[in-house]
């Protein structure tokens, strides 16, 4: 079993999740981040292997997602909450992308996602997303990216990886050190 979702594949999975939640009579909220948020809302060419999300009620959504995995022949953890420990809190600018009868699905705003992507700074997976998010946020300098990261993660040290990626995107421009 392998899962690879494009925008339509994500919608199909959410429709199936809607049916499973309806069987249980339970309403749920999902806040999608990472590659799935990019694929469904910000980059039509993007695909993802899973759906990273924060969801409630957690146990019921997990059970329903397992049923969806069986029905659609997806990986058992196609819907997971592995990124929740990296989420910087509430996103007042989130966007609704799917309103079923039982689940409500929203994605993180471009700035929120940019902060998460910069914090993770996985060069193999995040650089293209970072470029798209920079553009969507109307940013054009290294300093602006650092400010977004600091605004969502004010107590975290900016990883060297993030500085490296930003320097790669803006050669010749050096982001300021946090202490200056």
Segment roles from a protein language model:
Residues 1-180:
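Compositionally biased terminal segments of proteins
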């Amino acid at each position: 079993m392998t899962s690879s979702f494009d925008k339509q594949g994500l919608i199909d999975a959410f429709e199936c999740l809607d049916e499973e939640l309806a069987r249980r009579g339970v309403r749920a909220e999902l806040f999608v981040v990472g590659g799935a948020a990019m694929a469904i809302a910000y980059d039509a060419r993007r695909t993802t292997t899973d759906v990273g999300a924060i969801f409630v009620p957690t146990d019921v959504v997990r059970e329903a997602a397992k049923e969806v995995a069986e029905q659609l022949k997806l990986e058992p953890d196609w819907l997971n909450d592995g990124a929740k420990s990296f989420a910087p809190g509430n996103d007042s600018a989130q966007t609704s992308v799917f309103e079923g009868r039982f689940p409500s699905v929203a994605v993180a705003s471009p700035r929120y996602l940019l902060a998460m992507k910069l914090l993770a700074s996985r060069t193999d997976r995040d650089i293209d997303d970072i470029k798209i998010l920079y553009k969507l946020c109307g940013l054009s300098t290294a300093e602006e990216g650092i400010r977004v990261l600091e605004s969502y993660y004010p107590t975290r040290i900016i990883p060297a990886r993030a500085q490296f990626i930003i320097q790669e995107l803006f050669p010749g421009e050096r982001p300021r050190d946090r202490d200056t």
